[in-house]
Amino acid sequence: ILLVTPVWNDSARLAGFGAALATALADSPLSIHWIIADDGSAAHDHAPLRDLRDAFGEIFPRVHLHMAERHHGKGAVVREAWTLRPDAAWLAFVDADGSVTPAEMLRLIHAAVDSEMSVLGIRKRTASTEFIESPWRGIFHRGFLLAAHVILDLQCEDPQCGAKILRGSHYRRIAGGLLENGLAFDSELLCALKRDGSTWSEIPVNWIEKPGGKVRPLRDAWGMFKALLRIRKRRR
């Protein structure tokens, strides 16, 4: 199992989440390899990332730091990190902000392994899960869901949740056609898996928005809308 945590100028938030994740991974019976994938952060963030990698390694030795040469986007660095273990049976990623806790991510990984099916975390209020987001992010979230459904016919309750685990063999069949480097890469990924005949299960997770996130609804909405149109055009 290869688990990737993408970061970009985010060593401060990684510090708390990463320590908790390292502890959770060390306690897990699963064979997991963890890669912190830096998406071309500024030079002043390189040393803190290396220090964090070393500190996490004291807790969980199977952690590595991958440094992309330049910033291309979350999708690009996750895909790049996934190529580092081309034989991995499972490929996963979890965002570094801690909105999805390490315990929740491990729950998803166990669910995937037990069911032998790809698993997507989804942000959804249920009797057992909590979902807290700001009003502006909520509007952006619901608007993107509607756009993805209308433009791509994407049948997924929450394509953007930052916690996914995929069967490695299924991903590798479609990896060569994935081009979106930014925040729409999840939608392109799921569309490609669907066209290839792959299936997945969707599991609600506890998700609590954390301060300091990179998503800016007003700034990012137009770019993500254009990305959905690009994905649809390439599918034709």
Regions found by a protein language model. Give the residues of each.
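Hydrophobic helical membrane-anchoring modules
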Residues: 1, 153, 177-236
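Hydrophobic targeting segments
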Residues: 1-5, 21, 32-37, 225
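Short, well-formed alpha-helical segments that are part of the catalytic scaffolds
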Residues: 10-25
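Donor nucleotide-sugar binding loop of glycosyltransferases
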Residues: 10-13, 41, 74
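Short beta-strand/loop segment that forms part of the nucleotide-sugar
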Residues: 30-40, 66-68
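A conserved acidic beta->alpha catalytic loop
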Residues: 38-49, 98
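Acceptor/aglycone-binding surface of glycosyltransferases and processive sugar-polymer synthases
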Residues: 68-85, 90, 102-183, 210-215, ...
